[in-house]
């Protein structure tokens, strides 16, 4: 039996375009910040197909990098897990 480790992320941020999400993902990834580029859940964003997930421990660094790169997410949500389902609480 193969055990697959699933990484838990604490936040998800959405952007106005796929290019912005991809750009900030690549930038944060190169800085060794644990991020994941994912499809935007329909529950929170229908205008862009991509979103970036990140961990609580990286929140301050992510915010600093967004400001340094003049990137502003459409919204940031806290991921709330209930069993296998994810719900989202608007943070900013």
Where are the regions a protein language model picked out?
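Short amphipathic alpha-helix segments
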Residues: 17-34
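A generic structural signal for well-ordered coil/turn residues at beta-strand boundaries
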Residues: 9, 48, 72-73
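Short glycine-/aliphatic-rich beta-strand segments at the starts of folded cytosolic domains
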Residues: 4-14
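Short, flexible turn/loop "capping" segments at secondary-structure junctions
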Residues: 3-6, 43-45
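Amphipathic, hydrophobic secondary-structure cores in small proteins
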Residues: 12, 29, 33-63
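Short N-terminal helix-initiation segments at or just after the protein's N-terminus
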Residues: 16-22, 39, 88-92
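Short secondary-structure transition/capping segments
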Residues: 6, 48-51, 86-89
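C-terminal structural segments of small proteins and small subunits
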Residues: 60-92
């Amino acid at each position: 039996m193969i055990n697959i480790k699933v990484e838990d992320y604490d936040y998800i941020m959405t952007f106005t375009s796929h290019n912005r999400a991809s750009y900030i993902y690549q930038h944060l990834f190169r800085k060794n910040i644990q991020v994941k580029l994912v499809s935007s859940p329909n529950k929170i964003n229908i205008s862009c197909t991509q979103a970036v997930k990140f961990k609580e421990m990286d929140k301050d660094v992510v915010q600093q990098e967004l400001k340094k790169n003049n990137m502003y997410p459409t919204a940031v949500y806290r991921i709330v897990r209930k069993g296998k389902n994810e719900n989202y609480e608007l943070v900013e």
